[in-house]
């Protein structure tokens, strides 16, 4: 039986939300939005996450065509169990302090101060004049957009959520997975950009880790019981 669109959508939506809330890129988006125009930060982060989700789903969609569906199913099931155990372990180790938020903030602070020192030599009036003379496309793809895009892209590359998305796309309907993933990324990133540091600091990394661990294990059990053909 072919994997359903709704099944792929709901699994991808739930997995991505729990993986991204409290993630390094979530904190980065919140902090960047405090220092730069929100619309540019949101556009850069969302574009990056959409591209990353599409790439991950494409890899997962191609995998069953290169390797036996039976093997991709078993690998995906194993990944769910491994990520579930790792997430639970990380959740139990958390002491309640938002260490990742502090780490991301320190990294961005150093980068921000460096850029600020370089920009002091330029006249604000000249910058505004140049900006007005640039076409809209070049204004949109500004250094701020590129910065938000690159920080998010490289922060997500090789991340647990990316690997899980590849595995999910190999075992579920890829269109459902990409739709659920993009919607979840949009919800999380918008919340981070609009809520800023005040929202980010309220997130319990311990609870997020434990919740995502339980969800990964649940997906692993469902995948194991359904078998390669997707029948429970």
Swiss-Prot record:
Gene Ontology cellular-component terms listed: Golgi apparatus; membrane
Entry's localization field: Membrane
InterPro entries: GDT1-like
GO terms (BP aspect): calcium ion transmembrane transport; Golgi calcium ion homeostasis; Golgi calcium ion transport; manganese ion transmembrane transport
One GO MF term: manganese ion transmembrane transporter activity
Transmembrane segments: 13-33, 40-60, 72-92, 135-155, 175-195, 207-227
Name of the protein this chain belongs to: GDT1-like protein 5
Species, as recorded: Oryza sativa subsp. japonica
